[in-house]
């Protein structure tokens, strides 16, 4: 009887710790459903139906492992990835890493900010510039929560992630995809032509985001409670739940586009405005509105996450700190310049995804090196199998992103 009480008590304590440590992965997961994912998944679903769903499944599994490694680095060492690079690499390398990470954070933010502005434009009927102003105000308000600590921000961003997931449950109800074909597309790899290969590379490139690799290790480095092993165990649950939700959203985006556009003959849908305007007559005004709201929620939350990531890389690499509101103001400027110049926002979204491809390997390689170092990681060091899978992911991601980059430059998209 005593043994049972002790067992029940330890089980309750483990569940309590797991719940207390839940949140960082939800912030990181937002990076996986940003407006760049909207654009890529919609184009893939409209062009090839359910045939590229398997890419989303595998990309999400890869992203899940990467985020676990990032979170584990913070737990095991008490330092984030940027700080580890600063401590172990020569100063010129560190400065190079800082500059490229800042550029990538700004490119990411550009896509996310413009995506949210497009969402406001679609649902409110305002101009893109007015949508950008609303986006700026909303992100300032969300960032103010950071003054109260990490938990309130985790709750708001986690809530926005769940809202986007709920929105896509509604979209699936409206679009009524063929579940048998959807299941087949998730498990049977298919690349019917070179354009499909290009889009598959785009889906992967839009899924694995370098800025959240830096950010996640920062979100877990100050976690308290339990042993390191217990914190790591709780974090794996956090990542599994958050990334499963993000994976569902990406699958639902592509499946909705397939059901609504591909099988109705609208295979040329390539931008967010067009997707919104086509959804209304095909499904309903409600379906189009839900799409617009989900785009706003994803854009707002991901642009906040991008601002936080930029702060982490600056503090980590060069020990320099500026207030979040100053960083938010500076990183908004490129978005307003793009809008005022009248550039195509969807094309800017795509170009920003290509720019991100440069930073993925630069973040992944040191992450794998550090998490495979027994001196740094102790009992949380990577197993041989994790190392092997990690390096396979690095090679695959680099190869596909080179393909994506070359294809974009050559105008194959």
Curated annotation (Swiss-Prot):
The lineage of its organism: Bacteria, Pseudomonadati, Pseudomonadota, Gammaproteobacteria, Enterobacterales. The keyword Cell inner membrane applies. This is Divalent metal cation transporter MntH. One of its GO terms (cellular component) is plasma membrane. Coiled coil: none annotated. It holds the Pfam family Nramp. It comes from the Bacteria. GO terms for molecular function: cadmium ion transmembrane transporter activity; manganese ion transmembrane transporter activity; metal ion binding; symporter activity. Residues 1-19, 72-95, 146-155, 221-238, 298-327, 371-387 are cytoplasmic. InterPro entries: NRAMP_fam (IPR001046).
